[in-house]
């Protein structure tokens, strides 16, 4: 088997974890107590969903997941919620005091006390796997636990499981909606620390998701539950190929092979379609061409940036539901002709396509409509550098005045780490700029002499 272990860190990670596992259970017909009436092979079996669930002898399906937070309230909701019987109590780890939106507390003082326990539990999960393929790590950039503890954990996972893939689902601080003033500090410190440890990071920007909920689902104002259910759909689309048998099965390494041209350029942009409410879906049937087109609308992206200003390096379309390759090829051909999609000149315009015949599932009573087909597009584009630029700018405004820095230094960080992290991100922006430059320019000048 090719198992994946999910690690949900901090409030954002845990709440997205709730949404994801709720959806996985519905998709696979697993009840909140872990029983699965449709599963014939009790206690083991080689079913595709075993990549995400382990089975006990009593026929109970347990998520291969770990929930970690430095303070107990959010994880307590899992302990008392609908799915409390699904998880083993040891999979839910909490500390006593939170990281107070402070990267240094999450990474150095408070995080340090709990990290060995977390690694021990991860080891137990890993021991139940026959062929662990990697980790999916869910966290936010802005929080103290999400930024500080995640980066500490990633460093340690690289030591213990050097060759295993590590994919991140990271919540990028929303440009307008902010939960903490120091989000830019935390984001830049965590990105700097995890850059070399993460193989691929899918960024989700809260504001982009807010806008999608407002515009497409008419929810006013959207709550975190609304946001997380939408994020859950996206994560489910990306992981569907690992959990179901599809026509094209993509494993974790295959994502990286197709999306990451250089180790540092590993932040694909995610777009999902269709996001429509039940009353709208009742009146329209969306064709493959329509949902494919929707993926190239900046309005459906999970991060605010404009790919029309950038260049694509790779593009991966993951369809699910009632979709046939013929329709997909036609839709993509149309897009290539009429859309202003620019690929970098060193990359042929290949679209990698995965099709999964399991139609998308929705949470009953949720906001999303049940649709026949959906698509999730992962594209590596230079436009995502705009997101880094925005963050760097905010960091600079605060750091120029050394605002709030004493809180970090007081927890044992050195001021040098700030400037080091900032330089690394400047280098990342530069990397994106260079990747998008035409490779032919250098050769052109020499050619005119002949």
Swiss-Prot record:
The record marks 450 as: Involved in polymerization. Coiled coil: none annotated. GO terms for molecular function: GTP binding; hydrolase activity; metal ion binding; structural constituent of cytoskeleton. Undergoes a tyrosination/detyrosination cycle, the cyclic removal and re-addition of a C-terminal tyrosine residue by the enzymes tubulin tyrosine carboxypeptidase (TTCP) and tubulin tyrosine ligase (TTL), respectively. Acetylation of alpha chains at Lys-40 stabilizes microtubules and affects affinity and processivity of microtubule motors. This modification has a role in multiple cellular functions, ranging from cell motility, cell cycle progression or cell differentiation to intracellular trafficking and signaling. GO terms for biological process: microtubule-based process. PANTHER family: TUBULIN. Dimer of alpha and beta chains. A typical microtubule is a hollow water-filled tube with an outer diameter of 25 nm and an inner diameter of 15 nM. Alpha-beta heterodimers associate head-to-tail to form protofilaments running lengthwise along the microtubule wall with the beta-tubulin subunit facing the microtubule plus end conferring a structural polarity. Microtubules usually have 13 protofilaments but different protofilament numbers can be found in some organisms and specialized cells. This is Tubulin alpha chain. It comes from Bombyx mori (Silk moth).
């Amino acid at each position: 088997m090719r198992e994946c272990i999910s690690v949900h860190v901090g409030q954002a990670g845990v709440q997205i974890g709730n949404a994801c596992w709720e959806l996985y259970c519905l998709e696979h017909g697993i009840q909140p107590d872990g029983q699965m009436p449709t599963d014939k092979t009790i206690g083991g079996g080689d079913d595709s969903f075993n990549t995400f669930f382990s089975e006990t002898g009593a026929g109970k399906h347990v998520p291969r997941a770990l929930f970690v937070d430095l303070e107990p309230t959010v994880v307590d909701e899992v302990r008392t919620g609908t799915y409390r019987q699904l998880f083993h109590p040891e999979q839910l780890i909490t500390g006593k005091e939170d990281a107070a939106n402070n990267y240094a507390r999450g990474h150095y003082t408070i995080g340090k006390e709990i990290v060995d326990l977390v690694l021990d539990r991860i080891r137990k999960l890993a021991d139940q796997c026959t062929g662990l393929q990697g980790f999916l790590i869910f966290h936010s950039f802005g929080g103290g636990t999400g930024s500080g503890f995640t980066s500490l954990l990633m460093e340690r996972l690289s030591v213990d499981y050097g060759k295993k893939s590590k994919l991140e689902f990271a919540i990028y601080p929303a440009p307008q909606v902010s939960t903490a003033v120091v989000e830019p500090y935390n984001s830049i410190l965590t990105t700097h620390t995890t850059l070399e440890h993460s193989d691929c990071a899918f960024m989700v920007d809260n504001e982009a998701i807010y806008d999608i909920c407002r515009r497409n689902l008419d929810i006013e104002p959207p709550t975190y539950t609304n946001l997380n259910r939408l994020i859950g759909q996206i994560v489910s689309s990306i992981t569907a190929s690992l959990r179901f048998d599809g026509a094209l099965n993509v494993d974790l390494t295959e994502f990286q092979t197709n999306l990451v041209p250089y180790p540092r350029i590993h932040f694909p942009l995610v777009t999902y379609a269709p996001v429509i409410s039940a009353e709208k879906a009742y009146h329209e049937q969306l064709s493959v061409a329509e949902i494919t087109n929707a993926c190239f609308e900046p309005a459906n992206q999970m991060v605010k940036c404009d790919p029309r200003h950038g260049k694509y390096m790779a593009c991966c379309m993951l369809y699910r539901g009632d979709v046939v390759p013929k329709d997909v090829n036609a839709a993509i051909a149309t897009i290539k002709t009429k859309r202003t999609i620019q690929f970098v000149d060193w990359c042929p315009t290949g679209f990698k396509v995965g099709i999964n015949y399991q139609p998308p599932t929705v949470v009953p009573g949720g906001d999303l409509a049940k649709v026949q087909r959906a698509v999730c597009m992962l594209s590596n584009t230079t436009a995502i550098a705009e997101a880094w630029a925005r963050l760097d700018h905010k960091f600079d405004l605060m750091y120029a005045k050394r605002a709030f820095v004493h809180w970090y230094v007081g927890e044992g960080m050195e001021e040098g780490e700030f400037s080091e992290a900032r330089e690394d991100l400047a280098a990342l922006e530069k990397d994106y700029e260079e990747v998008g430059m035409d490779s032919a320019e250098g050769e052109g000048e020499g050619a005119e002499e002949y």
